[in-house]
């Protein structure tokens, strides 16, 4: 494995689940909880307009002092994703070198980069994806050292 040839496409999650800005926060919460993802690209007609994270949603949730689950759901159903999403998030492309994307990710606060082609979301690469790459690289290096 040649480190300088590894690209985002080699480790990204292709065709991630997305949400629309007008959808309610409750929809994003449901997707994140049911699918076990931590970030959702926000799109209009396939074009990236934002990113919503599990942390954004937790900060936006009504207080635990909300009288009932019904009140909680009502607030989350009435609030659009656009109200809390990260607008114009930093992105990368599938053919970007993995090391370059990692450097970009270090300068963001949301733990993932949407992968775009012509403004359309084609994937997402997260800290976990970079960790998977690191494990593979280290295992290969360890194997080469033992040869």
Features from the language model and the residues they span:
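A contiguous, well-structured "functional interface" segment within a domain
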Residues: 1-36, 40, 80
């Amino acid at each position: 494995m040649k480190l300088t040839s590894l690209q985002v496409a080699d480790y990204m999650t292709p065709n991630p689940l997305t949400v629309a800005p007008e959808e309610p926060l409750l929809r994003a919460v449901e997707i994140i909880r049911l699918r076990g993802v931590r970030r959702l690209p926000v799109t209009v007609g396939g074009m990236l307009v934002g990113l919503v994270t599990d942390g954004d949603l937790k900060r936006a949730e009504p207080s635990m002092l909300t009288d009932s689950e019904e009140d909680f759901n009502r607030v989350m159903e009435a609030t659009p994703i656009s109200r809390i999403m990260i607008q114009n998030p930093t992105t990368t492309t599938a053919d970007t070198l993995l090391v370059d994307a990692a450097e970009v990710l270090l300068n963001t606060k949301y733990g993932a980069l949407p992968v775009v082609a012509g403004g359309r979301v084609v994937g997402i690469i997260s800290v976990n994806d970079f960790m998977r790459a690191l494990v593979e690289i280290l295992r290969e290096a360890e194997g080469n050292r033992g040869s």
